[in-house]
């Protein structure tokens, strides 16, 4: 590569960089002398040398203590990685037999000579850094060791001085039913002949007596220390990580190895760098790290036991695979096995005994034999079958290569592959660039970068990149050592190769749990595992031969504790499941971690209906989906969610029930309901497997319990409780048989209080479950015929009442009512110890109570308290669905710990605390965010690979091409590359690994821009799920999801992707009143979240918004970063989000919806332009079961939606009656073309509204809304209406009198509004607590009734005190003094709080401090109207105005500190009593208030903001209900309140008009639009609305509406006809279009339409009257003058028709000559004008020809009549005898076709000849 003059690589004989030494020798980097790091430093001439130490013959020391040119007997490597037997000098001049990096004979860390930095002292035998012994003297004469190695004495060897060599034997192995004789080795040192007379204890004692264990003497006392000064001990000289020494290389005084265990580093007894197999000890991570071997130690050569390159009998590779006795290279390459590559020949880097990458032996990515850390499997390579390299030859999965050629085209191969695919050909000179990457030049085998072995081949070696070297055949670049010859030249090679094969067979026996050669980690701690099964055990062999589910697969990559996930499988381990399945069974479960093997339960898989041919791989004990994926817990079910039941019988559940495992938690079982079974559960999913996402576990609470492994009771949490079938019928029909449940009162007491009707109505009912919690229902509860077993489910951290929403009664009935829930045992779990945190201090530190409060608020509950002692979480709910603490809630503030796994194009996983609303599950619960697990669990990684031909990549972070945005639950789109790979049958992950190796990371771009579906989502979308691209969806949907849109969309957006059809409706249906705020709603509306939720999937209860604010209108376009569509551009099925704004849903007028997504459930497309039946479509749409994708998603649907169901007639009156009242009090101005309606000034309309609403508030469907309307109109009447008291006065009353009268009227309004609540409270408290009833009367200023009640209850002093209230101010002062005295004497502690409340009220004190540090608040538990009334009546003097009382009340609820706030906020009526917290929107100064409060503010401040007052949310929960808002605005306009902005007014007018239009009252919508001030906007809006609704077919209803528009609203009739013309044009009805255009006075358009479409048909059909009717109407000059081309078009037709009629008239009646003259003139005129008619079609030309022909005949007739024959002749007039001179000029101008023209010519010719004949006579 660099020409021959550069010699070998860095000093080797075949180096790539020269032939002379760095420091002036005759080689560049050292073919004949020491290289840069080679053996000789300054000048001796060698045969070879190199940077990394190829063999040299004359090395010299740095300081030249001995000669610079001592002869050497062998070679040495620069870093000591090769063999070295030549003599050399050490760094400090001590002679040695070979040199390396640190001047010892052997490699750098396993010296046999004194080291440069070793110990300082006497000569002794010591161990190198990695374990080999040396027996030389140190320069300072002391016993020395290697760089870090401990020293040992030179005493006579006793004990185990002879290296362990296991005796061999034979045994029988049964595989696939065939018995095979195999060789065995006895892995016990006492089995050797040398030690067969001794026991293990004796050998150990001799080792101890030989001081092979224990500290050495200090420096200068006969021994030396290591590099860091601690006392090394004699040892058997093993390595840093796998030595059997008792003192570490760093010698800190502990009797441990380098990592502190009593054994080797990674679990082997005498292992190499990373540990050869140790039989009886454990590793750093408490797992055996390899298989037991027969070696003692290795150097740094990753597999050799002696010095570099020397033969060794049995060694371990880098990761512990044993190899036979043979020389080993840097990575343990077995030089006798015709392989010499760096990464996997013999026992190379990854422990293989065969050729490099892709050979039959094993490869880096395609090993066929050896597996993970010392165990072996039989699997096919990923990129090739039997001989392919990483990118190399013969891949079966095909990347387009041919046999024996590499993919990269770097040459051809013949026998083995290097890493880049080229093979050396024996005896050849290489092939170009291909040779540069490994083709040996004259060598038999190439190593990683071209290092060759002196095997069968020519005399020349290859350089680093293929360049030839001439002086040596053993030089390497440092990644391999010179190897001994192969079988042809080495007599030991054959035996070594046989030993290697034997080792492979042994590894199969020793490793029953599989192996992955790519990522090797320590195995689990044997202390926590049962004793390993003996590999030759007949039972084990029988299990191996039983065809089951799993192939040989790796253990979990780390010591994990996977949480038990809910699944249809069982919780039992399956030790030998699937050990001998065929390769196709590996499709989904091959290289995935399996769970604990502690329990051996062999399950008959044939009993389960889960295992269809496609998805049977996905469900078993340790299916990959059961492991926590990056801390998140999901179970990918192969059946619908409602079929997630136990499938294997009671015996499995029993075993699961009593089975606990610290490693694998039992899988909670759920009962199987017979009603939920599906007949299609066995159907095969025939879609592209890689694109099918399975239905996720919808209920995160039921999926797993946090304490499953620690509490027996929690094992039952997610199963139905065992029922006691022996029970007696309750007289009231109440059923409660589940064990552990109780009621207060008890069931017996309930039976006693059952009345004679069989009804059981109990007050303050409680139902609970021992140890779990209870539910307390306040008030009277009717328990008659309630099946509490089915209704109430109290589980760990969860309570469910009414599982089925369809069976849930309305709010307030049954148990769906307000309640107080107490859940016991709610403690968080410590992430480290997995124990419950019960310490109150620690709970306070982590703010667990605050977390529970946040969870309560999120679920719509009101948090009450948390009791750490019992873990009781107490909260109140307004109605029931499901409440509880999910694992995601408990750990939402935890962040997963970082893992230090190898990165392969990774992307960081976002923290779990940034969950977005779109990640909420469809059942209303947020999808569980990632849980913070133990570090071992988190190191498990997130990739779930289910392909058989992929190696273990559980330690790999996920590829960012697999990262997907979190859809509901665990649904993600699939990357395009995955889709392509899966479609072609290629392993997607293989493709991803190739991409990661070749391509750089791509920038994250938004999906709306690059239109790809596999990129990372936006910042807000965290909580990512990473799924395997091959996860089958529900089996029940496989028959519906055939390949429809290329397979890419079907699995993503079928019903299985979101909800199973069997559960979608039942699970999602909830009463709309409870769907959002969990509060009683006053209408069919509930409080909606912000508007953005309309464009997302419907979410059932209880998704509670944290804020309740009014809708805010955006005045401009929302920035893209803040838009709800940001980052959602890839959501194909949601056309509101796909492609950003370009594909957003189009909302049209009249609530029409144009979208290209799926048609909404229940709606109909608008066909034939008829309004389809409206579907129920609330502000939040009803849940819709997603249908399978059966057509293109880009078909546009036009649908008609409505806010509610069709209204009954009486409900429609709520719309029409107030509009009629408004029209009655309005004036229509017709000064302009478009009429303008303005309200009449005055207050008369207010009284009409008030009178009407009082009558209408009876039994209407919307009684609650009308009731609020009544309060509003009566308040307007009190504030601005006529006062009867003032109307009787003749003179204008003074302002003071007006203020007092308004106060009285407002006071009466307050009393009336409080009456219903007061009556209800008095009825509840009159008997038990009359004092409370008295206070209720006082809140309505019903003082006389309060006095009477006090007297009736015997409280005469209170009655007397109440009667004085109407007196002077002195009564209040005296009461205040009395309260002060009681406070000073602390006597108030003995007075009832309710009584003190009355005293404080009468004293005018809203808040009174008691002596016991309590407060009496007179406004507590009062609505805002009564709180305001208290301020007006009791806290202010009688002369105070309304404004002053309102100001004082505002201070009561607006104080910044909670301690000073004593009154409730003026919430709208639909929110009163809901218990919800109203949070003000950030940066908003307009909190939500009641409309009545706004009216009071406007009365007090004339310039108060009208926009707040007219906001619909201040009136009703429906933000689109503008009925009252618009009428209020018109009333305020009549009162001269005109400071509403033009934009807000326009929105108000248009919104109310749209609402009326959607209800079918479009004529009243025009009435509303006629109030718009801007004439242009008004006219445009009215005309557009007319265009949408005017019908061509006249009916009595349409006629009445048109009459209303034209007569009452004075809408121009021509506008209506114009709208009809547009509709006729749309329907292609030309006749009606022309008629409507004529009526709309569009003369020109009408004429144009007639000429182009109607005239020709009329002429051809001789329908002259029809055409004449149109043309005569257009003929008047005032009209025809406005028509273009009237003279040459319409008038020609009209004259033609008139000529025909005149001729008929002349023929019927005798006419004068004047008439004939006129007719002659018209006919001759037509002859010249007919040709001017413009023809647009063949029909027009036909009509023109007919007209010309007929005109020609008319002309003859007229001329014959006008010129009769001579009187002498008796002949009658003959048209054929007309003089030619009169006829020919006109006939020639007529446009006639050829046949007509020929007839006319023939006639003219005959006339001409006749005239000639006559003239000749």
From Swiss-Prot:
Keywords: Acetylation, Autocatalytic cleavage, Chromosomal rearrangement, Host-virus interaction, Hydrolase, Isopeptide bond, Membrane, mRNA transport, Nuclear pore complex, Nucleus, Phosphoprotein, Protease, Protein transport, Repeat, Serine protease, Translocation, Transport, Ubl conjugation. The record marks 391-392 as: Breakpoint for translocation to form the NUP98-RAP1GDS1 fusion protein. Breakpoint for translocation to form the NUP98-RAP1GDS1 fusion protein. Residues 214-480 are annotated as: FG repeats 2. It is a peripheral membrane protein. The keyword Transferase does not apply. Residues 738-880 form the Peptidase S59 domain. There is a cross-link at residues 563, 603, 665 (Glycyl lysine isopeptide (Lys-Gly) (interchain with G-Cter in SUMO2)). Belongs to the nucleoporin GLFG family. Isoform 1 to isoform 4 are autoproteolytically cleaved to yield Nup98 and Nup96 or Nup98 only, respectively. Cleaved Nup98 is necessary for the targeting of Nup98 to the nuclear pore and the interaction with Nup96. The record marks 531-532 as: Breakpoint for translocation to form the NUP98-KDM5A fusion protein. It is linked to Chromosomal aberrations involving NUP98 have been found in acute myeloid leukemia. Translocation t(7;11)(p15;p15) with HOXA9. The chimera includes NUP98 intrinsic disordered regions which contribute to aberrant liquid-liquid phase separation puncta of the chimera in the nucleus. This phase-separation enhances the chimera genomic targeting and induces organization of aberrant three-dimensional chromatin structures leading to tumorous transformation. Translocation t(11;17)(p15;p13) with PHF23. InterPro entries: Nucleoporin_S59-like, Nup98_auto-Pept-S59_dom, Nup98_auto-Pept-S59_dom_sf, Nup98_C. Residues 670-682 have a biased composition (Polar residues). Residues 525-534 have a biased composition (Basic and acidic residues). This is Nuclear pore complex protein Nup98-Nup96. The modification Phosphoserine is found at residues 524, 608, 612, 618, 623, 625, 653, 673, 681, 683, 839, 888, 897, 934, 1023, 1028, 1043, 1060, 1064, 1329. The record marks 880-881 as: Cleavage. The lineage of its organism: Eukaryota, Metazoa, Chordata, Craniata, Vertebrata. It comes from Homo sapiens. Changing residue 882 to A: No effect in autoprocessing. Its main location: nucleus. The record marks 531-532 as: Breakpoint for translocation to form NUP98-CCDC28A.
